């Protein structure tokens, strides 16, 4: 009998019916369509540390990556981890699709003010913060001067509008780039103005919707007014598409993040200034993060958690922030002497961190986007008064909280 078992074993082995030990794979989705060098360096180090483990890092464009990650998880075939907008975390957590993460007290103390609030819900942390941005206004001085004005920072919405109108009326360019496409960063553009006018979307502690306010009505009215001196067809543009218009000299100014300077043509003489203040507020900015979530029930959940932690740890995170041109997500000056964000240019993006407003955390984040974008498109199309459109949007937001 013993010899029979041995013979059968050898027969199966010879026929190739006994599978070799399978190499382990960690599947990762990276929103944005590319794997950046800083992240790839960490992935390579992770694979070198774990012999036989490979990371399937799949780069997926922003337009589809979040839905893909969520659909796979809901279907019972989750990826190990995904880099995605932190706005998705509340829905993923409450649906039981991701697991909470542990960030050491030491690392928590390194983050910029407000960062951990963007990844927390119900007393738990649901993602490792991995990208952070604040915003500022980029102005093409050549077009401003061609329009007969001095290229100095407008401090108020009135000053910004007057500058944009002068460019629009006296040059071949539109005065300002306005985003109104049904896209997440259209909502983000609007929130930069809202937070510069003393407005808010909701009370983060109580959940009360505060969007229906005089400050929001003023902001929506101003957004519609800007559309009158903006590029043709704002509803066809999201923020990323405005960069090309700016490079082509077709718009005089637009709001972008600190990576903007690296995307702009060298021959553009520009200034970068704080977002002008509205009549009811002070200059502000949206504080927005993307993060790495670890999905529940993947084949190698522990490995996915380790990789997520490595990608977002001190030196690795610094390399990403510096090379990508991101607002520093951590207070790196506590870790090292020579940091990249000490210039006057970076001051415009770093100084507002303490007073900026967060991207709201809604369980139905698509309702948040739909409600705000509907109001933006409505004011541009003349479908109602700002007050009515804001009230309608607030009702949509209440359903998504």
Predicted regions and their residues:
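Extracytoplasmic "Venus flytrap"/periplasmic binding protein-like
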Residues: 26, 45-113, 120, 146-148, ...
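Conserved C-terminal helix/tail region of periplasmic/extracytoplasmic solute-binding proteins
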Residues: 48, 145, 228, 351-401
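A structural signal for short loop-to-beta-strand junctions that line the ligand-binding cleft
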Residues: 79-80, 108-143, 174, 282-283, ...
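Hinge/lid segment of periplasmic solute-binding proteins
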Residues: 86-136, 158-161, 189, 269-273, ...
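C-terminal lobe and pocket-closing loops
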Residues: 90, 258-271, 278-374
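Short, solvent-exposed loop/beta-turn-alpha elements that line the ligand-binding surface or hinge
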Residues: 99-113, 176-183, 197-218, 266, ...
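Extracytoplasmic/periplasmic solute-binding protein
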Residues: 126-130, 135, 158-208, 251
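Glycine-centered hinge/linker elements that transmit conformational signals in sensory
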Residues: 163-166, 205-235
């Amino acid at each position: 009998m013993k010899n029979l078992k041995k013979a059968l074993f050898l027969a199966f082995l010879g026929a190739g019916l006994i599978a070799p030990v399978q190499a382990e794979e960690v599947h990762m989705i990276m929103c944005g369509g590319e794997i950046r060098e800083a992240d790839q360096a960490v992935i390579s180090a992770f694979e070198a540390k774990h012999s036989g483990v490979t990371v399937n890092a799949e780069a997926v464009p922003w337009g589809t990556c979040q839905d893909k990650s969520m659909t796979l998880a809901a279907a019972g075939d989750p990826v190990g981890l995904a880099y995605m907008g932190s706005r998705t975390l509340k829905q993923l957590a409450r649906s039981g699709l991701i697991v909470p993460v542990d960030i050491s007290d030491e690392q928590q103390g390194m983050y910029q003010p407000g960062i951990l609030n963007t990844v927390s819900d119900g007393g738990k942390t649901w993602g490792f913060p991995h990208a952070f941005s604040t915003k500022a206004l980029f102005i093409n001085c050549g077009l401003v001067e061609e329009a007969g004005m001095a290229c100095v920072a407008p401090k108020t919405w009135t000053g910004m509008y007057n500058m944009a109108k002068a460019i629009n009326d006296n040059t071949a360019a539109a005065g300002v780039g306005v985003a109104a496409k049904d896209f997440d960063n259209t909502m983000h553009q609007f929130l930069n103005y809202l937070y510069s006018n003393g407005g808010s979307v909701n009370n983060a502690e109580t959940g009360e919707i505060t969007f229906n306010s005089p400050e929001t009505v003023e902001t929506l009215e101003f957004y519609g007014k800007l559309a009158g001196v903006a590029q043709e067809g704002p509803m066809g543009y999201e923020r990323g598409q405005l960069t090309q218009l700016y490079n082509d000299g077709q718009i005089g100014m637009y709001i972008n993040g600190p990576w903007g300077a690296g995307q702009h043509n060298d021959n553009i003489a520009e200034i970068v200034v704080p977002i002008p203040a509205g009549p009811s507020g002070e200059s502000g900015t949206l504080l927005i993060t993307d993060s790495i979530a670890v999905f529940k029930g993947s084949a190698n959940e522990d490995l996915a958690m380790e990789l997520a932690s490595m990608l977002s740890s001190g030196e690795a995170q610094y390399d990403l922030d510096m090379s990508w041109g991101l607002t520093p997500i951590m207070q790196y000056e506590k870790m090292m002497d020579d940091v990249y964000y000490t210039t006057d240019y970076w001051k415009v993006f770093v100084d507002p961190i303490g007073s900026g407003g967060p991207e709201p955390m809604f369980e139905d984040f698509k309702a948040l986007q739909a409600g705000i974008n509907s109001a933006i498109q409505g004011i541009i199309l003349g479908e109602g008064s700002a007050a009515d459109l804001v009230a309608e949007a607030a009702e949509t937001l209440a359903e998504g909280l």
